[in-house]
Amino acid sequence: MVQLNQNFIDTITQELPAHLSMDEFIAACDRPLRRSIRVNTLKISSDDFKTLMQPKGWTFDPIPWCEDGFWISYDEEEQLGNALEHIQGLFYIQEASSMLPPTALFTPSAFTTSAKWQCVLDLASAPGSKTTQMAALMQNQGLLVANEYSASRVKVLHANVLRMGASHCALTHFDGRVFGEYLYESFDAVLIDAPCGGEGTVRKDVDALKHWSLDDVLAISETQKALIESAFLALKPGGSLVYSTCTLNRLENQGVCEYLKQVYGDAVQFESLSDLFDGAERATTAEGFLHVWPQIYDSEGFFVAKLTKTASVPRLQPEPKLQKNFPFTPASAKQAQGIKDYFQQDLGISLPDELIMVRDDEFWLFPHEFNAFIGRMRFQRIGIKLADSSKHGFKVRHEAIIALAGKQLSPTAKTVDVSDVEAKEYLMGRDIPLATADKAQGEVIVCYGGAPLGMAKHLGNKLKNNLPRDLVKDKVLLLPEQTKSL
């Protein structure tokens, strides 16, 4: 049974829209959430994913605000996070409401000029659901800066970015309040899914509201105001900003947006989201925001606001000095050609036309747009590591294969397709015996379902596992095919 604090009920009763009832709200909070996932179109199309999973008993109910999002049902009690297809990065387990903010930011009308959307900021990124959703919407083009304040959550963010094959991200680890000054008016679009009271999450955490207090709400709303102001300062004139939370009270939602409007006046233009998807008007406020109560779409509670920065605003502090000793240098023409030839000739992968950078014996691929950010802030991770070099040549890195060996593969690529059982063995760090002995082929890309799992060394009679030890799994779930239609 859900635990609803009486102080919360008293407060939210005054804010609930007239067309909704408190009884329906409480009943919705007491129901378990529907399972929902988002297909990772960086690796597989939604149609192909459904074709892959329907024989395993999955049914798909489209989420109206996300083209690649689905409520799912299937006959398995196991944790989906252990599923082979999840480990492979074909889908992300993501609550339906949390797919709203990236959709709101990347509306078709946003793409008005080819110059827009080259630099995007996700101010509070972990664990990475919205970051990787935006990476897919950007099709790994441009630069996506993903920031996370919590050190432990940066590791989770990085793991999800790599698993999903997002190659154009730069990760940072800062308090989001510094971005307005360090990267003043640098981004075409900014998403801030702000830390909040989490009132909308009660359907998956029955104790989320047990200790609710107005004092806590007031305190966190002050942090949110500082974060949205920092995000607004980091936004270019003409750019779009989406502010979202998974909470329900006005202080953390409309109140934060109204604060920004009070400070910056006509430079802040609220954009209506009433036409974002069919049925959006059911959750649209007078300001044009989406205030999603859990009973409206049978989802988590959520809030989404979109605004345009119509004019430049003064920065609050002098521009910081550029930082020195950036550890990467551009590859020479000879080095760049060498790494391109290795990927093309040995692996069958055409490298994207991006910056090839060198650090010691490491070769990296950076988005072109990152040039404008060198020295302005310290980055935890940039782009993807392509390979290590030695006197014997190059050694490809796992993350490069995961990010680039999908749509970039040529017909001549050295790949070995494995069964689901063999894929499970591979992900558990084991070598794969080959049914028929053949001539040794050296480095090969191991694939399952048309998407890469990683590298192996073809020794003729087996595939020697080259999966990095830190990625070896203790458990991999194979979802069984169903013998009856569902």
From Swiss-Prot:
The active site is at C246. It catalyses: cytidine(1407) in 16S rRNA + S-adenosyl-L-methionine = 5-methylcytidine(1407) in 16S rRNA + S-adenosyl-L-homocysteine + H(+). SUPFAM superfamilies: S-adenosyl-L-methionine-dependent methyltransferases. GO terms for biological process: rRNA base methylation. Specifically methylates the cytosine at position 1407 (m5C1407) of 16S rRNA. It comes from the Bacteria. This is Ribosomal RNA small subunit methyltransferase F. Keywords: Cytoplasm, Methyltransferase, RNA-binding, rRNA processing, S-adenosyl-L-methionine, Transferase. It is found in: Cytoplasm. It is an enzyme of class 2 (transferase). GO terms for molecular function: RNA binding; rRNA (cytosine-C5-)-methyltransferase activity. Belongs to the class I-like SAM-binding methyltransferase superfamily. RsmB/NOP family. It comes from Shewanella baltica (strain OS223). GO terms for cellular component: cytoplasm. CDD domains: AdoMet_MTases. The keyword Transferase applies. S-adenosyl-L-methionine binds at A124, S125, A126, P127, G128, S129, K130, E148, D175, D193. Its main location: cytoplasm. Its EC number is 2.1.1.178.
